[in-house]
Amino acid sequence: MLRSILVALCLWLRLALGVRGAPCEAVRIPMCRHMPWNITRMPNHLHHSTQENAILAIEQYEELVDVNCSSVLRFFLCAMYAPICTLEFLHDPIKPCKSVCQRARDDCEPLMKMYNHSWPESLACDELPVYDRGVCISPEAIVTDLPEDVKWIDITPDMMVQERSFDADCKRLSPDRCKCKKVKPTLATYLSKNYSYVIHAKIKAVQRSGCNEVTTVVDVKEIFKSLSPIPRTQVPLITNSSCQCPHILPHQDVLIMCYEWRSRMMLLENCLVEKWRDQLSRRSIQWEERLQEQQRTIQDKKQIASRTSRTSRSNPPKSKGRPPAPKPASPKKNIKARSAPKKSNLKKSAS
């Protein structure tokens, strides 16, 4: 079984970025506060833009949930009204499985019909994904009895981060043993590294979330470059190593240049972290312009080479060898010439 959807796809709830600038937020819907997940995002699957709107809409099902007509009804409703917020599925939040919807509907619709109600169209099961063919969640995919070594730390009112206690091997990993290479903030470095994001941020917290993972929480102030939307709020930067390189300390105001990987913002050894200076930020903007110019030049050269290659294939060069040899004379004339003397000999003998 997978460990809390925490989850069907090893998705960790500590990640709290948002879509189009909207961060994940703590679940505030009373009916859903005891679900195995504790952060959600809006709009939900029913297009409610705020949790306040979702609360008003979900209240109509409270009596149905209270009579316990189905063991999965509450789970299904919360998966629709307060979907799980995970970094890997920001643009298309995970839906409940079709089988969960069908179980809730089949269990509760007979009772609803007794009061002249039918299963609502807005909760139709037909469009929901099937477990074997798509990404979806069901109660069976979630372990609710988490091990004792797992606890939740509230970093901000709107973000939860999971932390595990370390085993003996992890405790022996001292930061003093790590030797980080200094990356110099130069144009040559910027052009060669081709970073995917550049931000101005303040370091809020640095914490080890496993033997080979360090999470650095930063408060994003300015965004100079990014491949995907970065919210101006607190976001986690992931270091997938036992060493945190480059070294940074909490409460520093810094300029960070690094990479995104599978929608995660990474903080890796070959990335650049410098104390914030206006002059350096202006340089980074100029470096990005040079990088774009360099990439356009490379692209233009590739297009020219491609066109030249296509032209040479369609119009092959003519051969410059020796001229062709002349054709031999027709053999018929030679045959006639040879046969002429034979006729004259026949005439002489006849005479």
From Swiss-Prot:
Compositional bias ranges of the Basic and acidic residues kind: 293-303
Gene Ontology biological process terms from the UniProt entry: bone morphogenesis; cell differentiation; negative regulation of canonical Wnt signaling pathway; negative regulation of cell population proliferation; negative regulation of non-canonical Wnt signaling pathway; negative regulation of sodium-dependent phosphate transport; phosphate ion homeostasis; positive regulation of canonical Wnt signaling pathway
Compositionally biased spans, kind Basic residues: 333-351
Segments for region (Disordered): 293-351
Expression (tissue specificity): Expressed in the ovary. Localized to granulosa cells of periovulatory follicles and corpora lutea. Weakly expressed in adult tissues including kidney, brain and lung.
Domain FZ: 19-139
Pfam families (alphabetical): Fz, NTR
Subcellular localization: Secreted
Primary location recorded for the protein, binned into one broad class: secreted
Disulfide bonds, paired cysteine numbers: C24-C85, C32-C78, C69-C108, C97-C136, C101-C125
Induction profile: Induced in ovaries by chorionic gonadotropin (CG).
Single Gene Ontology MF annotation: Wnt-protein binding
Domain NTR: 178-306
Key words of the record: Developmental protein, Differentiation, Disulfide bond, Glycoprotein, Secreted, Signal, Wnt signaling pathway
Sites where a glycan is attached: N38, N68, N116, N194, N240
Signal peptide: 1-18
InterPro entries, A to Z: Frizzled/SFRP, Frizzled_dom, Frizzled_dom_sf, Netrin_domain, Netrin_module_non-TIMP, TIMP-like_OB-fold
SUPFAM superfamilies attached to this UniProt entry: Frizzled cysteine-rich domain, TIMP-like
Gene disruption: observed consequences: Mice laking Sfrp4 have increased trabecular bone, reduced cortical-bone thickness, and failure of bone modeling during growth, resulting in wider bones with thinner and mechanically inadequate cortexes.
Function: Soluble frizzled-related proteins (sFRPS) function as modulators of Wnt signaling through direct interaction with Wnts. They have a role in regulating cell growth and differentiation in specific cell types. SFRP4 plays a role in bone morphogenesis. May also act as a regulator of adult uterine morphology and function. May also increase apoptosis during ovulation possibly through modulation of FZ1/FZ4/WNT4 signaling. Has phosphaturic effects by specifically inhibiting sodium-dependent phosphate uptake.
Family recorded in the similarity comment: Belongs to the secreted frizzled-related protein (sFRP) family.
Domain notes from UniProt: The FZ domain is involved in binding with Wnt ligands.
Annotated protein name in UniProt: Secreted frizzled-related sequence protein 4
Organism taxonomic ancestry: Eukaryota, Metazoa, Chordata, Craniata, Vertebrata
